[in-house]
């Protein structure tokens, strides 16, 4: 199965621009015959950006959701992407797995949001897997991978997932000197080995300009860990990239 990771630039508070970029990346992935394209966390409004209070929409029916569904359908490709969801008085940091006909196969709400981000997002309360032509796929979002005991990824493994897709927003402070990525290798490797599954995390690039991490930069460096816990591929640091990885399923 050919997986594309769309390490795209996200401009906080600019959902129209960001969704147009996402549509372009989906089309580019499909043109290279990828089976699934994975995009970043909160790609519409940007992670923790307060514009979501005005701009986020429902799932299904909101503009971000429906444009991603239309792109998947137009390109006949599976799409996994993170967007902000409005449900009643609550906002959720959400992710969708969308089938090539535009159908929503899986809808995940981030369970393990950082403390300061909970002023904006309500945490989710459930996990699921979706059955696809390549087997079961699970979805988590970024810091979901950090739950004590790596419980979320391990639970998805117990539920039969052979691939876990994780929209992310990996950010570093202005004085960060690198290297970056060991915390993700440490989080992805053990459950990947234990359950013989693949975990893919796709981060955006671009600034964080709201909340406690104002001034930080999202740096990409997206990562795919294989069933032996080794690295199947990693994208560049700090730049946009469309990375293609053959995933064993």
Task: Map each language-model feature to its residues.
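Extreme N-terminal starter segment of soluble prokaryotic enzymes
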Residues: 1-5
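Hydrophobic residues at beta-strand termini and immediately following loops
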Residues: 6, 55, 108, 130, ...
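Cys-nucleophile CN-hydrolase/nitrilase-fold catalytic domain and related Cys-dependent amidase chemistry
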Residues: 15, 20, 24-100, 107, ...
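A cross-domain feature marking catalytic cores of carbohydrate-active enzymes
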Residues: 41, 83, 141, 168, ...
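CN hydrolase (nitrilase-like) catalytic-core segments centered on the catalytic cysteine
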Residues: 60, 64-80, 146-240
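Active-site catalytic loop in hydrolytic enzyme cores
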Residues: 60, 86-163, 167-168, 175-190, ...
């Amino acid at each position: 199965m050919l997986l594309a990771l769309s390490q795209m630039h996200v401009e906080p508070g600019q959902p129209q621009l960001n969704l147009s970029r996402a549509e372009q990346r989906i089309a580019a992935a499909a043109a290279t015959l990828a089976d699934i394209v994975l995009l970043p966390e909160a790609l519409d409004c940007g992670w923790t950006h307060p514009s979501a209070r005005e701009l986020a929409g429902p799932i299904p029916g909101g503009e971000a959701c429906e444009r991603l569904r239309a792109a998947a359908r137009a390109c006949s490709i599976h799409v996994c992407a993170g967007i902000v969801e409005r449900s009643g008085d609550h906002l959720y940091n959400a992710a969708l797995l969308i089938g090539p006909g535009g159908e929503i196969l899986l809808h995940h709400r981030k369970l393990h949001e950082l403390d300061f981000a909970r002023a904006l997002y309500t945490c989710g309360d459930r996990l699921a897997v979706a059955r696809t032509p390549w087997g079961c796929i699970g979805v988590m979002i970024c810091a979901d991978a950090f739950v004590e005991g790596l419980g979320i990824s391990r639970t998805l493994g117990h539920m039969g997932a052979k691939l876990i897709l994780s929209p992310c927003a990996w950010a570093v402070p202005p004085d960060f000197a690198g290297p970056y990525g060991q915390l993700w290798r440490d989080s992805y490797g053990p459950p990947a080995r234990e359950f013989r599954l693949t975990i893919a995390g796709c981060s955006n690039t671009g600034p964080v300009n709201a909340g406690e991490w104002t001034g930080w930069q999202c740096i990409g460096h997206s990562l795919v860990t294989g069933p032996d816990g080794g690295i199947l591929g990693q994208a560049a640091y700090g730049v946009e990239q469309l990375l293609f990885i053959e995933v064993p399923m």
